[in-house]
From Swiss-Prot:
Organism field: Levilactobacillus brevis (strain ATCC 367 / BCRC 12310 / CIP 105137 / JCM 1170 / LMG 11437 / NCIMB 947 / NCTC 947) (Lactobacillus brevis)
Family annotation (PROSITE patterns): RIBOSOMAL_S18
One MF term in the entry's GO annotations: small ribosomal subunit rRNA binding
GO BP terms, alphabetized: translation
Matching SUPFAM superfamilies: Ribosomal protein S18 (SSF46911)
Name of this protein: Small ribosomal subunit protein bS18
Keywords, alphabetical: Ribonucleoprotein, Ribosomal protein, RNA-binding, rRNA-binding
Pfam families: Ribosomal_S18
Entry keyword annotation includes Ribosomal protein: yes
Record's GO cellular component terms: cytosolic small ribosomal subunit
Origin organism lineage: Bacteria, Bacillati, Bacillota, Bacilli, Lactobacillales
Task of the protein: Binds as a heterodimer with protein bS6 to the central domain of the 16S rRNA, where it helps stabilize the platform of the 30S subunit.
Domain of life of the native organism: Bacteria
Length: 78
């Protein structure tokens, strides 16, 4: 049949922040924050990045603070 998917186990994504023992997500650390932003400048969801809910909330706050302070763009430069 034409619309079937092949079965296979997906590898669980690892929380980058927890794996590297990062306790405080600083809004000034733009190199870290850029890992969690798409090419268009949007914050990537948990299902893509693999971060925990707690760390995703911290990331979102840090990214928004960084944008307001002018360290990161709101949209990508095309």
């Amino acid at each position: 049949m034409a619309g079937q998917r092949r079965g296979g186990r997906r590898r669980r994504k690892v929380d980058f922040i927890a794996a590297n023992h990062i306790e405080y997500i600083d809004y000034k650390d733009t190199d870290l924050l850029r890992r969690f932003i798409s090419e268009r400048g949007k914050i990537l969801p948990r299902r893509v990045t693999g971060t925990s809910a707690k760390n995703q909330r911290k990331l979102t706050i840090a990214i928004k603070r960084s944008r307001i302070m002018g360290l990161m763009p709101f949209v990508s430069e095309e």
